[in-house]
Amino acid sequence: MNTLQLINKNHPLKKNQEPPHLVLAPFSDHDVYLQPEVAKQWERLVRATGLEKDIRLVDGYRTEKEQRRLWEYSLKENGLAYTKQFVALPGCSEHQIGLAIDVGLKKQEDDDLICPHFRDSAAADLFMQQMMNYGFILRYPEDKQEITGISYEPWHFRYVGLPHSQVITAQKWTLEEYHDYLAQTVRQFA
């Protein structure tokens, strides 16, 4: 599992790339699948923070077909500008490899699948304070749309593993910026 794989419109998935193995993840109202290590760290994070009654897993792994359906639905319902801001193109979504999670508050049962509510609460704040200690980063931070190509998504987290999550969070980087940093470091020592 390459937890640092960069996936976006400039770095699409390889043809037919799928996660090798998926497991049912806990703390969801429906069946959500993730790669085993991601599910394990998600569960550890939720239990360690005591948020079992406050947050839920809204989404995880999606097939390319499901991603295409979501893109087309959003396009029809919300238009192109909105869809490009909040929905990755099919073949360019981290959800397709089982390393991305969308998190929502339990009290928001009528949550939007595209933009679940996950901010302005003590539960979201606590999650944000601890996520990096379990390998997660906020994938699309505020004021970084020019870098990521996706608008601020306070509900969307990516598993990158330790210590990467701690470095990325401490530096307030995106995964794209971390990739640039790693490439520059390699060039310095090559």
UniProtKB/Swiss-Prot annotation:
User: Under what conditions is it induced?
Assistant: Expression regulated by upstream promoter elements. Part of the probable VanC-type operon associated with vancomycin resistance.
Effect of altering D59S?
Reduces catalytic efficiency about 5-fold with respect to D-Ala-D-Ala as substrate. Almost no reduction in catalytic efficiency with respect to UDP-MurNAc-L-Ala-D-Glu-L-Lys-D-Ala-D-Ala as substrate
So where's the catalytic machinery, residue-wise?
E153 (catalytic acid/base residue)
EC class name = hydrolase
Query: For binding a dipeptide, which residues are annotated in this chain's numbering?
Result: Q67, A88, S93, H95, D102, W155, H156
This entry carries the following GO cellular component terms, namely: cytoplasm
One GO MF term on file is: carboxypeptidase activity
Please name one Pfam family that this protein belongs to.
VanY
One GO biological process term:
proteolysis
Broad class of the protein's primary localization: cytoplasm
List the keywords (alphabetical).
Antibiotic resistance, Carboxypeptidase, Cytoplasm, Disulfide bond, Hydrolase, Metal-binding, Multifunctional enzyme, Protease, Zinc
Q: What is its EC number?
A: 3.4.13.22, 3.4.17.-
Outcome after substituting E153A: Abolishes hydrolysis of D-Ala-D-Ala and UDP-MurNAc-L-Ala-D-Glu-L-Lys-D-Ala-D-Ala
Catalytic activity reported: D-alanyl-D-alanine + H2O = 2 D-alanine; UDP-N-acetyl-alpha-D-muramoyl-L-alanyl-gamma-D-glutamyl-L-lysyl-D-alanyl-D-alanine + H2O = UDP-N-acetyl-alpha-D-muramoyl-L-alanyl-gamma-D-glutamyl-L-lysyl-D-alanine + D-alanine
**UniProt: Zn(2+) binding residues:** H95, D102, H156
Q: Report the locations given in the UniProt record.
A: Cytoplasm
Residues that, per the record, bind Mg(2+): E66
Q: How does it assemble?
A: Homodimer.
**Family per record:** Belongs to the peptidase M15D family.
What is this protein's record name? Bifunctional D-Ala-D-Ala dipeptidase and D-Ala-D-Ala carboxypeptidase VanXYC
Q: What is the lineage of its organism?
A: Bacteria, Bacillati, Bacillota, Bacilli, Lactobacillales
